[in-house]
Curated annotation (Swiss-Prot):
Keyword list, A-Z: ATP-binding, Cytoplasm, Ligase, Nucleotide-binding
GO terms of biological process kind: RNA processing
Source organism of this protein record: Aquifex aeolicus (strain VF5)
Protein name (Swiss-Prot/TrEMBL): RNA 3'-terminal phosphate cyclase
Disulfide bonds: none
Residues annotated as catalytic: 329 (tele-amp-histidine intermediate)
Similarity comment: family membership: Belongs to the RNA 3'-terminal cyclase family. Type 1 subfamily.
NCBIfam families: RNA_3prim_cycl (TIGR03399)
Top-level taxonomy: Bacteria, Pseudomonadati, Aquificota, Aquificia, Aquificales
Taxonomy, superkingdom: Bacteria
Amino acid sequence: MGEFLELDGSYGEGGGQIVRTALFLSTLLQVPVRIYNIRAKREKPGLKRQHLNIVKLLKRFAKAKVKGDELGSIELEYKPQKLKPGYYEVNFDTAGSIPLFLQTILPLSLFVPGEVVIKVIGGTDVPKSPTIDWVRFVFLHYIYKVPEFIRLEVLKRGFYPAGGGIVQLSVRNKLEKQPENLQEVKEYLKDKVNLYRTERGEIRKIHVFSVAHEELRERKVAERQAKGAIEALKNLGYPEPEVYRQYANANSIGTSITIWLEDTKGNVLGADNLGKKGKLAEVVGAEAVKKLHEDWSSGATVDRHLADHLIPLMALVGGEIRVPQFTGHLLTNIWVCEQFLGKIFEVDEKEKIVRTQGIS
């Protein structure tokens, strides 16, 4: 293999997902990685600020030695050391996506010996990304049993274009040292993460979380987004949801809505949407319901965002999920994991199932 595991960043859909997953696995497994042709198929190839923000933290969090960490760079060499507990702060200086940043950093925080607090300043609810509430109420559901303590707090909302949102992740683990090998990783996660999820139950609860900038309070935008979602859910035959409405001060005016359902088998699926100028608040809510309904009515046990988030964890601990659809994103994510761990995934496109025993 040489000093670095070589990854072609143009493989498959060739996007930033390759970078995010590779940095997670490289850091956890202590495998240096060289990614070339980064985002080569995109209109603006190379590393984006959101990827550099992850690297910026990992240079401290994992004492990583890095080459090529520049805006637009099509090659990155990354050599991590062990994760260090402590307090870290990262300021994006843009409305870059905090949820996509956390796709790498949040799972890594589960393997830090002791306590880690990470404060991030950027975008909490921005385009081409899940909302921060989706991370809090959907993704966290699958991993919260791993640490002794975990809290993900939204201290301030950050909408596009100004950003300035503040999120703080606090984690305390019962670990004296970072797992040394694949078997220790699997053993640590074994009884805390259950990703064998092909069975569905009845819908137990539905939640609607509607957020709008404080300046939109008079126009009752948070209420109207929620109303659009409630009516759409009712028209599709879903149970009445629990509704949360919030007005927030932020550097830019914006809105978001996140909807998630829980079933009796312990599955949680979510969807979200952002408001924009000229779009009725009621439509924003209804569109979020449409996304959730598309995923749930497909027979899936995970939503479209969740599949990407769970694949790297499945590679470590094993799992079986039913996805809404096979996307280039999903298949590329599987490919990245298999570059580190060998051929471990099985894909059943007819049944829309992804399964793996994980590392052996």
